[in-house]
Design a protein with these regions (language model features):
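Alpha-helical transmembrane segments of multi-pass membrane proteins
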Residues: 2-610
């Protein structure tokens, strides 16, 4: 999600008296904005059972609201200064009428839609106006400060310090110690001093313009250089790639790799840090060598389940996000226009960020039955990164006439070895020929770094060889996967164990024997010797033969086979996709064979059980 950004040629001159005022106001506003983001997402989280996708939907809304705030600031930029100040204060006043922060009441018909569609609407109805008002103030204040020719770029540091500070302090200090209701009240009251400081900044800017003789008219200046459509689209594309990658990596990590409270704050903090480094012109952490290596490495594991290597997968994903986003944001910083065009620059960056988020958080879940957005964005970012060759001498030879047979023969041989070898990537038992083919494809991809089209093609071949073909085959089969707001579900057979498995990422939701005589016998966590198995065996003794039993979570429906005559059972399942899978006898027969009339209530059991 783009933050307030700009070039940072900080002049070592006398600091004007109002610089501290503007810095403090921007810092406070940015801190409030990035306090509101995790706080409201945390407030909404229980309404959808704590699904990790809630944060992706939240990010999508925040990107859209940030775009609206930047667009508002850009529109006001053309107005007289007094009118700008008045309009911004009026917007804050109108937005304050929606406080305190709380979940808005929405039509019941909304919740009949996919959560990925209605959840951003819930965010907009609840905090949309106040978020836009606060998001606009940093851009406006930079514009006000720059009136009369002053360089506003040092205010960028204050904006990012507030954003990153709030984002890091929230999970460490605020969330563990302060209740959500109290947080919402404190945040709502904090808008008042922000409005007062904004008014004082506006008054200071107006007085300064009058003091230097400008009044409400701008001093004569050379016309700004025109900006073409190609450059605007370039800004948007360079912002869209990392923004979409942020959501894709966050989803991958929180669903498939590691599950931890508020873990999604970490990728967002890394994303913000790349903006700070890129626009500060810092030369630290050069991505030229590391980013292509990480792209190739992650391409090798994109279609592979994390399993026991989840920690290494998480570290790799975060490093990938950092170096790739840093490299692309540095290209974006190099394209920064003159200060008079700053608000337009911000609008296109915010618009690109929103487009990337829209694809990763909304379009992809509705369009794909698997997280194909991750490899798509990985290839797109590899092109946007435009890295130099890993070695110019090797690149010159490799793309010369003498290397032509090798240049095409290496990936062709790798592909041939992979195709002719048995594909057992799901079991992580690679045969020598298959492993050799993958090594050749990875080597060819590294040799192609610096040639964007060739690099992208080699990455796609590499991902196809490391599970991409199997993933597409599963999608084309039509009945092996299902995707919903709550995750990507996979139904597949394990011939070695003789069972059919039901998984979501690294989580096993159920298994059923493929042997007819054992098909209705509870397995996995629910077998007779498990804790649940022993408890269910004791139910008639403890609660009688007419016991009323509620089960939270349906999975494959395994526990339905513990139901005994006379008992009254109710299942609570939050995801309709899980209900459809469990009821489909072509997938699992627990419900059809043991309790075909089982009552299933769709929704969060914490809200529906009463």
């Amino acid at each position: 999600m783009p933050v307030m950004i700009a070039e940072l040629p900080i002049a070592r001159t006398h600091v004007p008296r109002d610089a501290v005022l503007f810095s403090a106001t921007i810092l406070g506003g940015s801190a409030l904005l990035f306090w509101l983001e995790p706080m409201f997402a945390r407030l909404v989280l229980p309404t959808l059972g704590g699904a990790p996708a809630v944060w992706n939907s939240a990010l999508l809304f925040y990107q859209a609201a940030l775009f609206a705030g930047y667009l508002w600031a850009h529109m006001l930029h053309r107005w007289p200064l007094r009118a700008q100040v008045g309009a911004q204060l009026m917007l804050i006043a109108l937005a304050a009428l929606t406080l305190p922060v709380a979940i808005a009441s929405v039509p019941a018909s909304w919740k009949a839609l996919d959560p990925v569609v209605w959840l951003p609407g819930l965010f907009a109805a609840s905090i949309g106006l106040i978020f836009i008002a606060v998001a606009a103030q940093a851009s406006l204040l930079q514009s006000w400060y720059a009136r009369g020719g002053r360089a506003p770029w040092f205010l960028y540091a204050a904006s990012n310090a507030g954003s990153l500070g709030a984002l890091l302090f929230y999970p460490l200090l605020i969330e563990p110690a302060v209740s959500l209701s109290r947080q919402a009240k404190v945040w709502s009251w904090a808008v008042l001093p922000l409005a007062l400081f904004t008014a004082v900044c506006g008054l200071s800017a107006v007085r300064r313009r009058a003091a230097v003789g400008g009044g409400e008219r701008e001093s004569a200046a050379a016309p700004a250089q025109p900006i073409g459509a190609a450059l605007r689209l370039r800004w948007a594309a360079l912002a869209a790639g990392p923004s979409g990658l942020l959501i894709a990596i966050t989803s991958w990590l929180t669903v498939d790799v590691i599950s931890a409270p508020l873990f999604w704050v970490v990728p967002l903090a890394i994303y913000l840090l790349t903006f700070i480094l890129a626009f500060s012109r810092s030369k630290a952490f050069s991505p030229d060598l590391i980013a292509p290596l990480l792209i190739v490495a992650i391409s090798l594991i994109t279609f592979v389940r994390a399993g026991a290597a989840s920690t290494m997968f998480a570290i790799g994903g975060l490093l990938l996000l950092f170096y790739v986003a840093l490299g692309i944001h540095r290209r974006l910083a190099a394209d920064a226009p003159e200060p008079t065009r700053a608000t337009e620059y911000y609008v296109w960056i915010a618009g690109g960020g929103m487009a990337g988020g829209l694809f990763a958080a909304l379009v992809a879940p509705l369009l794909f039955d698997w997280t194909y957005e991750q490899p798509i964005l990985l290839v797109a970012c590899a092109v946007l990164l435009d890295p130099p060759p890993l070695s110019r001498s090797i690149d010159a030879f490799w793309h010369g006439a003498r290397a032509l047979p090798w240049r095409y023969g290496l990936p062709a041989l790798g592909t041939l070895l992979y195709v002719t070898a048995p594909r057992v990537i799901d079991d992580a038992n690679l045969g020598p020929a298959q492993l050799g083919g993958i090594v050749l494809l990875a080597a060819a991809a590294l040799l192609a770094v610096g040639r964007n089209f060739s690099f992208a093609v080699h990455l796609m071949l590499l991902m196809a060889a490391t599970g991409g073909i199997s993933a597409v085959e599963s999608s084309l089969a039509g009945n092996q996967r299902a995707r919903s707001f709550f995750g990507v579900y996979r139904i597949y057979n394990d011939p070695k164990q003789g069972v059919r498995l039901f998984t979501n990422g690294t989580t096993l939701h159920g298994a059923q024997s493929m042997l007819r005589r054992f098909a209705l016998r509870p397995t996995t966590y629910y077998n007779p010797m498990s804790g649940i198995g022993r408890m269910m065996t004791a139910v008639p003794t403890l609660f009688g033969t007419a016991a009323r039993i509620g089960v939270v979570g349906l999975g494959a429906g395994t526990t339905a086979c513990w139901k005994r005559p006379g008992q009254d059972w109710t299942f609570f399942e939050i995801d309709p996709a899980v209900v459809a899978i469990a009821r489909d006898p072509s997938h699992f027969t627990y419900i059809a064979g043991c309790a075909p009339d089982m009552r299933i209530i769709i929704g969060d059991a914490r809200l529906r059980a009463g």
